[in-house]
Amino acid sequence: MVSIIIVNYHTSHLLLHCVDALEEQVKGVDYEIIVADNASSEEELVLLRDDKRFTLLELDENVGFGNANNAAAQMAKGDYLLLLNPDTVLLNDAVTLLFRYMDAHPEVGICGGNLYDSDLQPTHSFHRLYPSFLSEMDFALGQVYRKIRFRGNAQFNSSEHPIEVAMITGADLMIRTDVWNKLKGFDTCFFMYGEDADLCKRCKQLGYGVVAIPEAHIQHLEGKSFMESESHCRRILDGRFTYFNKHYGTLYNKLTDAMNILSLHIAVFIYRLRRNERAVTKFSNRLRIYKEYATKHKLHR
């Protein structure tokens, strides 16, 4: 059986749409749904309490993505956990496809499918690199290295076969329950962002594979405007700060932050030479956010 865990925070309408799609699409495996609510409003909870399709876990406060999943996982009965975002919609029986792959490949600890955006275009589904000095520099410069090295498979599996990756995003992550228990779930030091990278890294350290399955199709409705918003950028930086401190230490964090700021200055300069005002605006905003964040955490000297 697969235990599907969905963390909700003021997204009840989206969550119910997600559950509708699960009910419609999943035919090949037994499953249960556990919803962990991060102290949403009473109006939101009213929409969920009487729904018999899932078990509702009402948390007293917003404990973050990872901690809410940890709490729900303690209630799970399945041999596999599938962590799903509430703004996801199954486009096929992705749950069964992921389950069957895991069941046939005991050496794999974590897997995930291909994600599509609101326009049904391929979107980031995994990462081929762990967060690091190199990945941060590449991101600051527009992910040139990843595009060259991995071609069409940097964040989306455009091949016809499973591929080994560094990490699966937390939007659709299936993990063996026994592996989850060995890892003790998500590290509680993460609030939101970074916990999926940390989980996958620790999974690989146990000797298990992390694999992207192209046949499993899931729509992820997270808006493109939000992806570029200051709020999203700052949350990612919080996760990065925690991840680097845990795995590499404070000095590494400081060096990476300084490198990011330098790389963004270079990117702005290059796009100005090319007279690409849209890119100049994008990278200038990103540079401002990095500088403010670095100052806040006393990482930029």
Specify the residue positions occupied by each region the protein language model found:
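Nucleotide-sugar-dependent glycosyltransferase catalytic core
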Residues: 123, 200, 212, 217-239, ...
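Non-catalytic, C-terminal membrane-associated alpha-helical segments of glycosyltransferases
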Residues: 231-239, 251-301
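Acidic donor-binding segment of Leloir-type glycosyltransferases
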Residues: 19-61, 71
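Conserved donor NDP-sugar-binding/catalytic core segment of glycosyltransferases
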Residues: 91-125
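Short, flexible, basic/aromatic active-site loop/helix in glycosyltransferases
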Residues: 130-165
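N-proximal low-complexity "stem/linker" segments adjacent to membrane-targeting elements
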Residues: 1-24
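A short, conserved alpha-helix in the catalytic core of glycosyltransferases
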Residues: 158-160, 166-217
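Short aromatic/hydrophobic "clamp" motif used to bind/position activated sugar donors
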Residues: 81
